[in-house]
Amino acid sequence: MIIDVATYTDGRREEVDDLAAALERCRRGERGFVWLGVHDPTAEEFEGVARVLHLHRLAVEEAVQGHQRPKVERFDDVTFAVLKALAYYEDRSAVETGEVMVFTAEHFVVTVRRGQLGDLGPVREALQADAHRLRLGPRAVLHAVMAHVVGGYRAVDEALEQDVEEMEEQVFSPARTSDAARIYSLKREVLEVRRAAAPLVAPVRALVERGEAPPGDGSAHELEHRVERGLAHG
């Protein structure tokens, strides 16, 4: 379902009633972009969007089906990013995952959320309050989304680190107990964080090197740091 759709010109938001007409206005004026946000779209719902924006068939299928490996790919003039959103539930020592996918081109960005995690409302609100960043266009949205998702990795990583430290204290205490199942579970969750972050490091670096990252963007360095933390725990 469509969560939000608007155009942004010189950092100002305008509501959109007709996606195709809004996109044409942005292209004709050679400024501004459309930002469409959807959640758990069906094939039928996304078909119309894909037709208007001329999205690549393979990327559309992946966005609708979900369960994709984290990556950043290029289809003609559209960048397609797949990100894993993570949350850690300490009561059951479990990392839950969701998916966030982002299509970006010169005059549009489409954010697709699958599952309950990865709410992008705070990202849109933060950007709408920062006209300077919005003027950078869809690339600013892409990297704000990346920073938001990676921030979730940080929270999960820190929670896992605390649990690992507690387990180590128990193992080496005089009254230590053997909890092989929990140790195995924690190691499995550490791997979940690594699987989410590791595939993104190289493509995010490439975005920065190609000049597709906003000036001063730190997503690549943050991703590298998250992977290093996961490796340290492994």
Q: Where are the model-predicted features located?
A:
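Peripheral, non-transmembrane regulatory/ligand-interaction domains of membrane transport proteins
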Residues: M1-E222, R226, G230-H233
